[in-house]
């Protein structure tokens, strides 16, 4: 769903930080 996609994107950004 939309939330899952947003969460996945946030996780990527946090992991790259």
Curated annotation (Swiss-Prot):
Modified residues (4-carboxyglutamate): 3-4, 6, 9, 13
Main subcellular localisation: secreted
Gene Ontology CC terms: extracellular region; host cell postsynaptic membrane
The keyword Iron is assigned to this record: no
Subcellular location, record wording: Secreted
Tissues expressing this chain: Expressed by the venom duct.
UniProtKB keywords: Gamma-carboxyglutamic acid, Ion channel impairing toxin, Ionotropic glutamate receptor inhibitor, Neurotoxin, Postsynaptic neurotoxin, Secreted, Toxin
GO MF term list: ion channel regulator activity; toxin activity
Other comments on record: The mature peptide does not contain cysteine residue.
Entry function: Conantokins inhibit N-methyl-D-aspartate (NMDA) receptors.
Protein name: Conantokin-Qu
